[in-house]
């Protein structure tokens, strides 16, 4: 599974996919906007989809998820600092990690329709789930 994801990941444009996915998360699950109060105008779907801070942060998030592919046996240690930050500083509900993973799957399927096989989806879902679990580690 992870070889399949690693091979696919090289085709993923973190800027385009990450920005679109985070924007989609904020539109589809509006309560997640409370974590982004410093990002400026989130008043409409259009504003969110064109918000430079949302797009840049989405790229950063997707790049961090991609970094996890280099540490498949050690995700919890790899994401320990990010887990603490999201738990202790940002107080992000860990259920949101699963929502974001689902949104990433949706956006990737949209962009890579022809190569988005059930096997790839399964492998991607396993990776996003493992990353979400690692990020939730600091929660008590």
From Swiss-Prot:
Keyword Metal-binding: yes
Protein name, per record: Hemoglobin subunit beta
Domain Globin: 1-140
Residues that hold heme b according to the record: 57, 86
Keyword set, alphabetical order: Heme, Iron, Metal-binding, Oxygen transport, Transport
Source species, domain of life: Eukaryota
GO BP annotations listed: hydrogen peroxide catabolic process
Stored InterPro entries: Globin (IPR000971), Globin-like_sf (IPR009050), Globin/Proto (IPR012292), Hemoglobin_b (IPR002337), Hemoglobin_oxygen_transport (IPR050056)
């Amino acid at each position: 599974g992870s070889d399949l994801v690693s091979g696919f990941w090289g085709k993923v444009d973190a800027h385009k996919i990450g920005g679109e996915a985070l924007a989609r998360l904020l539109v589809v699950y509006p309560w997640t906007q409370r974590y982004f109060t410093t990002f400026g105008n989130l008043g409409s779907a259009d504003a969110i989809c064109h918000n430079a801070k949302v797009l840049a942060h989405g790229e950063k998030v997707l790049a961090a998820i991609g970094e996890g592919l280099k540490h498949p046996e050690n995700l919890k240690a790899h994401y320990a600092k990010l887990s603490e930050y999201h738990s202790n500083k940002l107080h992000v509900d860990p259920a949101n990690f699963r929502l974001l993973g689902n949104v990433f799957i949706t956006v990737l399927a949209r962009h890579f329709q022809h190569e988005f096989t059930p096997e790839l989806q399964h492998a991607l879902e396993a990776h996003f789930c493992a990353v979400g679990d690692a990020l939730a580690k600091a929660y008590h």
